[in-house]
Amino acid sequence: MYGNQQNNSNPYQMSYYRMNNGQGQGTNRWPQQLSHQEMLAGHSQQILNNNKPAGNQSKPPIVMASNNVFSIGPYRQRKDSSRISVLQKYEIIGYIAAGTYGKVYKAKARDYQNGMNRDNVIILDSPDSVSADSNLDINSINRSTRQQEANDNLTTMDFRKPSHKRFTPPNNSNSTQIRSNSGSETNVRINSSSITNNSRKPSQIQFYAIKKFKTEREGVEHYTGISQSACREMSLCRELDNNHLTKLVEIFLEKKSIYMVSEFAEHDLLQIIHFHSHPEKRLIPPRMLKSIMWQILDGVSYLHQNWILHRDLKPANIMVTVDGCVKIGDLGLARKFNNMVQTLYTGDKVIVTIWYRAPELILGARHYTPAIDLWAVGCIFAELIGLRPIFKGEEAKMESKKSVLFQANQFQKILEVMGSPDHKIWPNIDSYPEYLQLAKMPKYRDNLTAWYQTAGGKDKTALDILYRLLQYDPIKRIDAIDALDHVYFTNGDPPVCENVFEGLNYKYPPRRIHTNDNDITNVGNDNNQANHSQKQPMHGNNNNKNGNMNGLGVNKRILAAAAAAAAAAAVSGNGNNPTSNTATGGSARKKRK
């Protein structure tokens, strides 16, 4: 069968092979007698023979590089030496705050060279940067049936396309109808100066927020993988694209640390509430209050329509830009909930800050719904009205992570305002694990109306939507789509504004930045220092005068304590050799047993 085939371009179809072992005359064998390795060797030898030039001067065959070139050590060194430091691209202005999972800094972009190698940077400015195998199953994102019936022309959110600009100023009017994620129309007043943060003039300085995720031990470089919170936040922020969610710009992987660069917001609701409550109480204007709530619910609606729970909504996580655009931030506790059979309780026994935690969570619910976010939104709404948390309880600290204590004091604060629930208000209340604890508590009547009037509230529609957001039964609690359709937002008195600061005759103070904090040690103030660090391999830079390990700096006292502990351990373990690991910033440490 092989003798009849004349195609000699493929060596596997040649009628006859001549194998040359390089040590003399080759051996003639039929293809049936050749192994796969011999066929490949014969093919390679034939290619080398065909590439030899005519004449006696033949070039030696190409020799493969040694295995050392492709080993992980030299490869990692080359990659580390060519990577871009976060300090090379951004100038750190100051330290903002620290949370459970990381520290946040304010920064601005440096004069950056486009020709630099950017292997350690994940650019997210364009939708093309989103990979096809993203963590979010885009095909599984469906809208509810009632939303499709409400607006057949509104298509499903596509993460790979930039968000649609819903706010389009008309030619000759200052008010228009805008369409929310739910498909409902709302009267909104448009200000020509209220274009969002992405449309700044080129002459204006663009600021960024850089979040550095905490490591297991500060000042110690180690490979222990990426935390669950960091994975969730990075994967979700890469996919989500909504005007009322903070936008992720890029991600840096540097010195075994992760840095998330996001758009910067000058204010947050906690700061605004503090401004209105100190030194004397001044209520938030009704139009500003309504506009803030509409934009929060629009962002929450977008998350829930895409099967995502935020699980940590509170005033400190609601940002407001200088243009008056409200943005939901900090998705460290967010997660998908499309699999309703799987419990959401495992591994996340404590979620949502205690003052904004829904009653079903306090009662030990294993399977919870997006209603927990709407309860938190109701608590935020009440705090914006009264300028203090409506349910300000004391959290009982857990002695063990294996069990979650019943937060009796927090639930009592809820009962004092909302009254005691019964089976008529909450039919399946007795099915929760901690129901017996609730049954032992004193009985209270509903005092929300009295609380609202005492806080200075006058709008009855605002009180009605507050009642619906703070329903005990999560099944009866209003969802984000219906909340956007509530008469409180649709009556147009006052109208919802894209710029929540519109009409104010005062300005809120900028966010407080700590420029003399020990943790940043004046990082980013010297451009020459950043350019010099660009030329030095990052893995060998242990003599940094500012002690800037792990990218954005480590407290010198921590390094000194670590060095002292290492010296003490060396003295106790080696007797006469106390200088094995000292004074080098902890670059050489003993392995943990």
UniProtKB/Swiss-Prot annotation:
Active site: D312
PROSITE patterns reported for this sequence: PROTEIN_KINASE_DOM, PROTEIN_KINASE_ST
Bias (Polar residues) ranges: 169-185, 518-536, 573-585
CDD domains: STKc_CDK8_like
Catalytic reactions of this protein: L-seryl-[protein] + ATP = O-phospho-L-seryl-[protein] + ADP + H(+); L-threonyl-[protein] + ATP = O-phospho-L-threonyl-[protein] + ADP + H(+); [DNA-directed RNA polymerase] + ATP = phospho-[DNA-directed RNA polymerase] + ADP + H(+)
Name under which the protein is recorded: Serine/threonine-protein kinase SSN3
Annotated Low complexity bias: 186-199, 540-551
SUPFAM superfamilies: Protein kinase-like (PK-like)
One annotated Gene Ontology cellular component of this protein: mediator complex
Source organism, top-level taxon: Eukaryota
EC number: 2.7.11.22, 2.7.11.23
Cofactors (names): Mg(2+)
Subunit structure: Component of the SRB8-11 complex, a regulatory module of the Mediator complex.
GO molecular function, one term: ATP binding
Gene source species: Kluyveromyces lactis (strain ATCC 8585 / CBS 2359 / DSM 70799 / NBRC 1267 / NRRL Y-1140 / WM37) (Yeast)
A Pfam family hit: Pkinase
Function: Component of the SRB8-11 complex. The SRB8-11 complex is a regulatory module of the Mediator complex which is itself involved in regulation of basal and activated RNA polymerase II-dependent transcription. The SRB8-11 complex may be involved in the transcriptional repression of a subset of genes regulated by Mediator. It may inhibit the association of the Mediator complex with RNA polymerase II to form the holoenzyme complex. The SRB8-11 complex phosphorylates the C-terminal domain (CTD) of the largest subunit of RNA polymerase II.
Residues that bind ATP: I96, A97, A98, G99, T100, Y101, G102, K103, V104, K211
Region (Disordered) residue spans: 161-199, 517-551, 569-593
